[in-house]
A protein has these predicted regions:
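Active-site-adjacent structural elements in enzyme catalytic cores
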Residues: 1-178
Length: 178
């Protein structure tokens, strides 16, 4: 982000410009239409975000894995010494996946496909549970494709083949048919 401000400041030399006040305000967010997965290719962004985005920040470095922002809540500690150091995850994503959650017991390799709304998947391998990034609602083709990409990627990086698959029994849910 500093490169954007450096450019907007006229490419000053040194570092004094970093401490100076600036009237420039940029609000940037992930590139995705409401309810759809993140757009990861420049040409796709230019096509799908027309009429939504005021401007584009493009780069020649490809995004390989879609991963939205994590949302956490700080937790109070009884004595306030470690306040906020153990987050409560509202949405586990960038920065926290696929960091494993330790389980008490060893078991079979399981792929859990999550629900229809606010979807995420989980792979259990040994005594570790690996949650995927936030996928979102499975109410459009792009989200279903993202679910399929996520399953393929997580199984590949963990080098596992599930012995059991857990899914919702509703016959019309996309995760039931995966």
């Amino acid at each position: 982000h500093l490169l954007l401000w450096h450019e907007a400041a006229g490419r000053p030399s040194g570092t004094d410009w970093l401490a100076e006040a600036s009237d420039l305000l940029l609000v940037m967010t992930s590139a995705n239409p409401h309810g759809e997965p993140l757009v990861i290719a420049n040409d796709e962004a230019l096509h799908r975000l027309t009429g939504i985005a005021d401007a584009y920040l493009l780069h020649d470095r490809d995004i390989v894995i879609r991963c939205d922002d994590s949302v956490v809540r700080a937790t109070p500690d009884e004595n306030q010494e470690n306040w906020g150091q153990t987050p409560i995850f509202l949405r586990r994503a960038r920065g926290y996946v696929p960091v494993p959650i330790q389980l008490a017991d060893d078991g079979p390799t399981v792929l859990a496909l999550g629900g229809y709304l606010k979807n995420t998947i989980c792979v259990i391998k040994g005594r570790e549970a690996f949650l995927s990034q936030h996928i979102g609602g499975l109410d459009n083709a792009a989200a279903i494709g993202f679910l399929e990409e996520t399953v393929t990627h997580l199984l590949a990086i963990l080098d596992v083949r599930p012995e059991l698959i857990a899914h919702d029994l509703h016959p019309d849910f996309p995760s039931t048919h995966l």
